[in-house]
Amino acid sequence: MSMVSNGILWTEEIADALKRDGLDLVQFSLDGLSDESYDYVRLSGGRLHRVLDAIRIARRHGIKVAVASLPHVRNIKEYPSIIDFCEKEGVSDFRAQPLMPLGRGEHNYKDLCLTSEQNDSLAAYLSARNAVSQMQITWGDPVDHLYMYRETGRIPQICINAYGELSVSPYLPITIWNLNRSTLRDYIDLEIDRYALRHPIVDRCLARIEELSDFTSMQEGLPILFKERNIDISQELEDVARVHGGK
């Protein structure tokens, strides 16, 4: 079992409880190594130290740690130090990916995003560090998983939000299952992901996304991502799947 966290509320007690309950891996977000760069996007009020402590706490409790990082104009020069820190603390996987024009990122995109040259330079640097690091270092493409959906007709991961809703993707405001109403076992047995990808709303969304710039919080006909409740097609998908026996 794995989870993602900003790390700010992690304590020894929380890590111990999560480990006992079966947590194997946690991915923390580390968007800078100075209070200035971190809070330029996180607005945590000087709580970067809590994130750094969370990484150490998780490792002390035998939990595998991955780190995700958002490159932006204030932290671009910190990546050698960020990677040094992660290697020193035993982080197993480090992933950076370009800023996406979603949520606050959309409203502040011009102030935060790197130039194409900066993105290319950082990608090359990460590749070079990966070649000599025991830690897996990747430059991520947030569009890749949507290509995989279209090619395979399956959704190979489960995206659960704070409301117990499963979505097609963290970047699309479409709920395909609700754990408050039905079990995860039913979701798997009924192969709901297959029906979700065939649904016309989902199909139209996936068809229009070819590159990073195609993402937006305000797609026509959809709720504003992170600000309005998702479109919920979960009951419709469940009804269809039960009629067809999940195939």
List each language-model region with its residue ranges:
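Generic structural signal for residues in well-ordered beta-strands
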Residues: 1, 137-139, 176
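Radical SAM/AdoMet-radical enzyme domain recognition
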Residues: 1-98
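Short, solvent-exposed loop/turn segments at secondary-structure junctions
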Residues: 9, 33, 72, 100-101, ...
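A short, terminal or domain-edge coil/loop segment
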Residues: 56-65, 83-88, 117-132, 148-159, ...
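A C-terminal junction/extension of Radical SAM enzymes
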Residues: 64, 76-78, 102-168, 210-217
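Beta-strand scaffold of nucleotide-dependent catalytic cores
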Residues: 95, 168-170
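Flexible mid-to-C-terminal extensions adjoining Fe-S/redox cofactors in radical SAM and related proteins
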Residues: 171-247
